[in-house]
Design a protein with these regions (language model features):
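A detector of single, family-specific signature residues
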Residues: 1-289
Length: 289
């Protein structure tokens, strides 16, 4: 039996082929993650006598090209947790790490665990895209939180508590009422610099333009809040630019987050287990970030 140890890195892999009792079938050599080089590797491994199994570590996405190609070529591929391999054979006082030694170590690990090596099965396209989309969603959510905190920090000096003026939830497209409001009124003096009647009329026009419900009492509350706060940042073109740009960045992140959320919902709905999961108690759709 032959065990192929593959130490994977970005765009390339180190290959070593071992047999029991420490027999080196093929000394360690490097293979790029290109179709031509992987084809040559497949042919080389296919010409070996006896059963051949391939062992590699989970390394983010780096192992996927080699694992998928060799799986499609008909080889028994096993992708094992890196911690399991790390603790294997670590009795030496001198633990030098090289790609060649790691490839041999993986091959020996596969020989010692031959009967229990888990078989790698590639994910179908829908699940792969769903997982990838979710990772992007998580990254985008972190960016949105950072941008939202940045905008609130700016408003603390230009329009204190503006983010608390409205309790409306975010819309399906990711937009929020308070964010849209400060884009039009980036400074508290944009409100208290007007008379109560003029601001109310202007606020009503703004609500109609953006599709929000107008409430007379709410307009008066906003006016009272703006007039009751002291702004540190002066009302200048620079102050307006800072707030408007912060709003623009936050809107873009929120729109991206909403688009990714809708795509995840669409992908998940195509899975066969979706109706069963959605029928479970406590499970519901996520509408906001």
């Amino acid at each position: 039996m032959n065990c192929v140890g593959i130490d994977v890195s970005k765009g390339k892999s180190m290959i070593a082929v071992m047999r029991p009792l420490g027999e080196v079938v093929i000394p360690p050599f490097e293979v790029g993650h290109t179709e031509s080089e992987l084809c040559e590797l497949s042919k080389l491994l296919g010409n070996l006598d006896g059963e051949t199994r391939v062992v590699m570590e989970t390394t983010g996405n780096y192992h996927l090209p080699a694992a998928s190609f060799l799986y499609d070529s008909g080889f028994y591929v096993s992708v094992v947790n890196a911690m399991l391999v790390h603790s294997y054979g670590n009795n030496s006082l001198r633990r030098a790490k090289t790609d060649k030694k790691d490839a041999i170590k993986l091959a020996n690990y596969g020989l010692d665990h031959w009967l229990t090596l888990p078989r790698y099965i590639p994910e179908d396209d829908v699940r792969l895209m769903l997982k990838t989309t979710y990772r992007q969603y998580q990254q985008c959510a972190k960016v949105q939180t950072m941008l939202k905190n940045n905008l609130i920090s700016l408003l603390d000096t230009a329009f204190p508590d503006a983010n608390r003026l409205f309790a409306s939830p975010a819309r399906a497209d990711g937009s929020e009422k308070w964010v849209d409001f400060v884009a039009a009124f980036p400074h508290c003096e944009c409100v208290c610099g007007l008379s109560e009647r003029v601001f109310t009329a202007k606020y009503q026009k703004w609500c109609r333009k953006h599709g929000y419900n107008f409430n007379q009492d709410k307009a008066l509350d906003i006016y009272a809040s703006a007039c009751g706060h002291f702004s540190v940042m002066p009302r200048t073109d620079t102050a307006k630019l800072l707030v408007v740009q912060a709003v623009s960045h936050l809107r873009a992140a929120s729109a991206s987050l909403a688009a990714l959320r809708n795509e995840m919902q669409s992908l998940a709905a195509s899975l066969p287990e979706y109706p069963v999961v959605m029928g479970m108690f406590g499970v519901c759709l996520l509408y906001t970030s």
